[in-house]
A protein has these predicted regions:
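Glycine-rich beta-to-alpha transition loops that act as phosphate-gripper elements at the mouths
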Residues: 15-20, 39-41, 60-67
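Aromatic/hydrophobic pocket-lining residues that form π-stacking "cages" and hydrophobic walls in ligand
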Residues: 2-3, 22
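C-terminal helical cap(s) of enzyme catalytic domains, especially alpha/beta-barrels
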Residues: 6-8, 74, 90-118
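Catalytic cores of alpha/beta
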Residues: 21-29, 46, 65-81
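Anionic-ligand binding region
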Residues: 9-11, 19-34, 44-50
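Short beta-strand/loop segments at the ligand-binding rim of alpha/beta enzyme cores
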Residues: 5-14, 53-61
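Glycine-rich phosphate-binding active-site loops on the catalytic face of alpha/beta enzymes
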Residues: 1-2, 35-44, 76-98
Length: 119
């Protein structure tokens, strides 16, 4: 019902899942992409393993994605990156360091651009 409602209003629907069965169930129900959580417990190889027989899947890792692992996830086939605390740093927010937050966002964007340009 949630996926159907999202599509009714032309919104992308990205439910969370972990196991291959959960991921396939979400896509069969019409999900546009599936966020895999907690991705860091399985690592980028898990995405490679999932995508080998099912390359049509659009997956985004969430949980533990940071500047050190972003390229690994993209190289493993991630369609997007779910980045939380590695991008929205509490200390930068508390200090109202918007330039610092913007710099972090640029670093992530640069990694995405560099990784995608390599393929």
């Amino acid at each position: 019902a949630v996926i159907e409602m999202g599509h009714r209003y032309d919104r992308p629907v990205v439910p969370g899942a972990l196991t291959p069965t959960e991921i396939l169930t979400a896509f069969a129900a019409g999900a546009d992409m599936v966020k895999v959580f907690p991705a860091n417990h399985f690592g980028p190889k898990y995405f490679k393993d999932l995508l080998a027989p099912m390359p049509q899947l659009k997956l985004t890792p969430t949980g533990g994605v940071d500047l050190d692992t972003a390229a690994d996830w993209l190289n493993a086939g991630a369609t997007a990156l779910g980045v939380g605390s590695a991008l929205v740093k509490k200390d930068l927010i508390k200090a109202r360091d918007w330039a610092g937050l913007a710099a972090l966002a640029r670093q992530f964007r640069n990694i995405v651009d560099q990784t995608r340009n390599q393929s």
